[in-house]
Regions:
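Adenine nucleotide-associated cytosolic modules
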Residues: 1-553
């Protein structure tokens, strides 16, 4: 069955401005609740572009009691439509859409996922529907989130494409300083030589000495060190400590000498690529390029060629603050910027050659600005290999695959929240096996544990029993054995989580939902902007103990 124009929100027609480009994404939220609304609030305010809520429920008294984005006049109206209307008041520049068709019929339509860049599904949800969402996400390479928020506990899992590269990872500023002091190029060496002239024979004036950039000081004393050590630079911690002593002894009272002393350990490092970066260079996507390869992989291949040739990555070109005359500091900046431009130009030439070799259309030529950004952050690029999130089906064993041993080890760690993940899997399996009329359950056609007046004791036993079974299956799959008292302690921890989520009866506490929605929104923005490194791949929050943990499951 085809999706009509009325069913699918219209695409963006206008050319977006710079700010709009950053957040111009289509987001689909399957099912609405307090956590989902809190997430959307944090996405609408900065300007998500487009969002769609799919929810066939109508607003009830219970909804009014937990959601700040519904009002008395909303009672009896479609929850999705009312939520969209009120959310859009936060930012008129955002386009919101509501689909009130039942999820189980809407998802059977052709191209149901086509307009969207990201999907978020809220528990409880029918396992077969979640399975279809996961499958579509994997086929179309559309990132998908699946979250729980029950009482004081919450979690969310993220399904990313098989290869999800991030260039703009925003590393700590101290980690991005790359001055190449161990491998200076002629222009830098000459500048340092000029600025330190007269330093050894004492002919330099006191003001000039006090304003020598610390990078030049280190280059000067490195030359002295090499003369005394067969041309070798300090490489071990002991040698660097001795070198620091040499620098400080030259003039312990001047600020620039103190800056040079403090910079030794963090700047005198070989310009080698990290193992994570080398893994990206060796990835099949970088080795087997074709005309339709994403720009990231063409640039990665070109930078890999640069690294193989020069044994160093392209120079970022940034210079940290340091005590110096303004003219000298600007001159030093220009030297680094010039070298960075030269390195980038070489990478650009390699990219153009790769485009020719792969038969890439000139209309699809990689933007030079994108290449420049890659070169600046080449030392900190990151690749996430997406994993499908787990789905609990009635009567089917849950497997952990190649993560079984690691997760079995997590089970025995008292501080680990893997037990909470197991409890939510058990919660999902309970939901999958207990269908009821929509008016009686915590979700459409589904019954959540503890939702009935007299269900707490019975449902706690059932959910705990399912969780214990998952624990035993995990230990067996890992091919290991957990002895007492660790085994009993593990089951007790899992049992406590199960009791807590059943006690909540499927209800969401607004403070926990608000926090979880904020976490979700943060990760959504990371994914849609490809900035910072997203969660890989499951985040767990225990509101009772105020603890959070990220696990790759």
């Amino acid at each position: 069955m085809a999706v009509t124009d009325a069913d699918v929100p219209p695409p963006l027609l206008d050319i977006p401005k710079a700010k709009e480009k950053k957040y111009d994404r289509q987001l689909r939220l399957w099912g609405i609740g307090v956590t989902g609304v809190e997430m959307l609030k944090n996405l609408v305010l900065p300007g998500i572009g487009h969002f769609t809520i799919l929810d066939s429920a109508v607003v009830s008294e219970a909804d009014l009691g937990v959601s700040f984005f519904l009002e008395d006049a909303s009672l009896g109206r479609f929850r999705a439509a009312e939520t969209v209307r009120l959310l859009m008041e936060l930012n008129p520049g955002v386009q919101g859409h509501a689909i009130t068709e039942p999820l189980e019929t809407f998802i059977t339509k052709d191209n149901a996922f086509s307009p969207y860049n990201l999907v978020v599904a809220a528990a409880p949800i029918d396992a077969s529907i979640l399975e279809r969402i996961r499958t579509h996400s994997q086929i179309l390479h559309v990132p998908a989130f699946y979250f729980h928020s029950v009482g004081y506990l919450s979690s969310f899992s993220l399904l990313l494409p098989p290869a999800f590269p991030i260039v703009d990872t925003h590393p700590d500023s101290t980690a991005t300083t790359d001055l190449r002091l161990l491998r200076p190029w002629p222009a830098l060496s000459q500048f340092a030589k000029e600025k330190t002239a007269g330093l050894e024979d004492g002919t330099i004036s006191a003001p000039d000495k006090a304003h020598i950039p610390w990078a030049c000081l280190l280059l000067h004393y490195l030359e002295q060190w090499k003369k005394q050590h067969d041309g070798k630079v300090p490489s071990t911690y002991k040698e660097k400590s001795e070198f620091r002593t040499l620098v400080r002894a030259a003039d312990p009272n001047e600020e620039n000498f103190e800056e040079a002393y403090a910079a030794v350990l963090k700047t005198l490092n070989p310009p080698t690529a990290s193992s994570a970066v080398r893994e990206i260079f060796a990835a099949p996507e970088a080795q087997q390029l074709h005309a339709a390869s994403p720009a990231f992989w063409l640039i990665a291949k070109a930078v890999a060629q640069f690294y193989a040739k020069h044994e160093q990555l392209p120079l970022p070109g940034a210079v940290p603050d340091m005590k110096a005359q303004s003219a000298d500091y600007i001159a030093l900046q220009n030297i680094y910027k010039s070298k960075a431009r030269d390195d980038c130009a070489e990478v650009v030439a390699s990219v153009r050659e790769l485009e020719k070799q792969t038969g890439r259309s000139p209309k699809q030529a990689v933007d030079e600005k994108e290449i420049e950004n890659f070169c600046k952050g080449a030392a900190h690029i990151h690749l996430v290999r997406g994993r499908p999130f787990q789905i609990a089906h009635a009567g089917q064993a849950i497997t952990f695959g190649d993560r079984a041993k690691a997760m079995a080890m997590e089970l025995t760690m008292p501080e680990s929240l893997i037990g909470l993940h197991v409890a939510f899997l058990a919660w999902d399996e309970y939901v999958a096996t207990h269908s009821t009329p929509a008016s009686e359950g915590g979700g459409v056609g589904l019954k959540v544990p503890g939702s009935g007046a007299d269900d707490f004791g019975t449902d706690t036993q059932r959910v705990t029993g399912i969780a214990q079974k998952i624990v035993d299956c995990l230990i067996k799959e890992a091919g290991t054995f957990v002895e007492d008292p660790e085994y009993s302690e593990t089951k007790n921890r899992v049992g406590n989580f199960c009791m807590e989520i059943v006690r909540a009866g499927g209800g969401e506490l607004h403070n926990i939902a608000s926090l979880t929605g904020g976490l979700l929104a943060q990760e959504v923005i990371k994914v849609i902007t490809r900035q910072y490194i997203p969660v890989d791949n499951t985040c767990l929050f225990d509101g009772v103990a105020s603890r959070t943990q990220v696990l790759r499951i």
